[in-house]
């Protein structure tokens, strides 16, 4: 944020979080319980939705075929990455690239809208002044879904601030 600017600052990347900066101090309203219980609108959450959509046969057939071609979807391979390897949240987030690539397809559009709405209501709207200050974002999910994010924020009369892919970009 510009120096001493009051703002809500959010992360939408592999994981997600949100805080309020009063110009001097960062305030956290929602205590994160980690990627399994929290992380609305994160790469790991989108990866989880895509895998479930695929395995529960909710994903459109053509999209499912392409998903199979791009990823190893063998159950044993997936379970190994989720339960035996470190950072299962990062593994799940690798599927977010597919979602971003297909963000204009109805199946992915619905997932994106649902998760963004959840993030806005569960995180951003916790702060009473969420309509008065800009909301800045950092992370690849926010960066690559900036247009969708802006539409969702506008729906709730929330002002989108800066959107950066990585902290170093600022």
Could you tell me what each predicted segment is?
Residues 2-8, 51-170:
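ATP-binding/phosphotransfer module of carbohydrate and carboxylate kinases, centering on a glycine-rich
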Residues 1-65:
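Phosphate-binding/catalytic loop of phosphoryl-transfer enzymes
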């Amino acid at each position: 944020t510009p120096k001493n600017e009051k703002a809500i600052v959010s992360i939408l990347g592999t994981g997600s979080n949100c805080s309020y900066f009063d110009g001097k101090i960062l305030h956290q309203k929602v205590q994160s319980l980690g990627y399994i219980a929290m992380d609305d609108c994160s790469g790991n959450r989108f990866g989880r939705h895509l895998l479930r959509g695929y395995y529960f046969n909710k994903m459109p057939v053509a999209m499912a075929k392409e998903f199979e071609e791009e990823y190893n979807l063998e159950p044993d391979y997936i379970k190994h990455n989720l339960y035996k390897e470190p950072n299962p949240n990062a593994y799940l987030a690798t599927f977010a690239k597919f979602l971003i690539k297909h963000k204009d397809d109805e199946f992915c559009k619905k997932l994106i809208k649902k998760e963004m709405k959840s993030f806005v209501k569960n995180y951003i709207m916790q702060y009473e002044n969420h309509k008065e200050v800009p909301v800045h974002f950092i992370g690849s999910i926010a960066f690559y879904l900036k247009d969708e994010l802006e539409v969702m924020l506008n729906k709730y009369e929330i002002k989108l601030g800066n959107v950066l892919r990585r902290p170093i970009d600022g």
